[in-house]
Amino acid sequence: MSQSVFEASRRRTFAIISHPDAGKTTLTEKFLLYAGAVGEAGAVKAREGRRSATSDWMEMEKKRGISISSTALTFDYRGMQFNLLDTPGHRDFSEDTYRVLAAVDSVVMVLDVAKGIEPQTLKLFEVCRSRNLPVITFLNKYDRPGRAPLELLDEIEEQIGLRPTPATWPVGIPGDFRGVIDRTSGEFTRFTRTVRGSAIAPEEVISTDQAAVEEGSAWAQAVDDVELLDAVGAVVDSESFLAAESTPVFVGSALTNFGVRHVLDTLVDLAPAAGERLDVHESPRALDSGCSAFVFKVQANMDKSHRDRIAFVRVCSGKFERGMVLTCHRTGKPFATKYASQVFGAERSTVDEAFPGDVVGLVNATDLQIGDSLYVGEPVEFPAIPRFAPEVFASARPLDTGRFKQFRRGLDQLDSEGVVQVLRDPQQGDANPVLAAVGQLQFEVFASRLEIEFNAPSEVTPSPYESIRFTDEESAERLKEIGGIRIMRRGDGRLVALFESRYRLQRLESDEPELVLEPINVGT
């Protein structure tokens, strides 16, 4: 077995998805605590006098206590190397999450027991389904009042189409949490609170006879539920899990650390290792072939003192070594990897080598774009990174015209990250750009980063546009003659038409079908 194949077998590259406030960032912190990567779990919210979450680094994340940009966290657990791609928790940042899901091999889905499947969770799960990603489910906040677990299992099956197979089952109702039954061993682990969840939770395993006496009717009800689950065949099955047909379900409380170890152990025992990646021709790239990777995220100014630009890549094959020269498939140009890092929140460590499944931050990646394929030896091109079509639009202008140079530099850098698209008028250039995004909060972040990172305070105001379409030069000339339509150009050079009225767009598509008006679909 080659070194690349062996190391790939040790990798577990995954992401956590959830609706905002379901507990994703909390669970991320607790994974790091249990793996020994941090000595004390960071606070999820940035409250005055307490530190913000370890994985949150951007100024706005610290102030608001939400995850806005995804970060790659690496830690070891039970002899495996975990690569956890932290994802934005706010609904307006689903596009960044979408890209992260293109770089992982499995997913942990966090559900609030009081709310069940929520809109953002459902939207992100559809992305998981499109990539056939295995999903582990964690029913969180069971120490608080919530819905019956059997009801939640029905909802999982009905709304997302995965067969839920509980690996642990709760004793007690939500808000009166006594512990869980391990359905494999039959053991009962009693729930014990820890102070603010800052330390690993003690795990008291007691006999079933003792549990029957001490937990009374709560134990009897849990045993009845487990017998029902056994009768309907709702048991964890590795084959159906890896085929994305079933989802192992765990019950716990991330805030108090209960159930965290169960999920980590399942990632080791059941989750897929890094495997061969398919190229655009659907041919697998052998793990032991020349080094290859693809860019799934670009982030500017993670180091304020250097105003740098990092391209995050997922290694797909071979052994990455710092200093090696990779070729970019899109441009055919070489890229020297002199500066390669692992990023842990705002902290960095130099990466000298990496293997399939690993995430590496390539510093000073000014010529790399999201979706770029990199390789050594035999050329390879991996599939494009999917993206959502913009749904909201805004205009931007610098408050101080003397800072226009900084404003323009900020536009270029933040546009290159691909979350907010900067649209420019072909005649006016940077003078009156339109921002296009998936959600409104992205504009607030955009303005904040322009001011903090580029010293270019700006005004961002809503634009009246409702729809966007790709067009061409010939159609653009006709569209310019019609009111309520504006022709702009994306950073990649493609012309787009912005429509103030969806009705007008529909009429044009019907009355003048010869016009080029292509929807901006996933991957374009």
Where are each of the predicted segments found?
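Structural and coupling elements of P-loop NTPases
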Residues: M1-T524
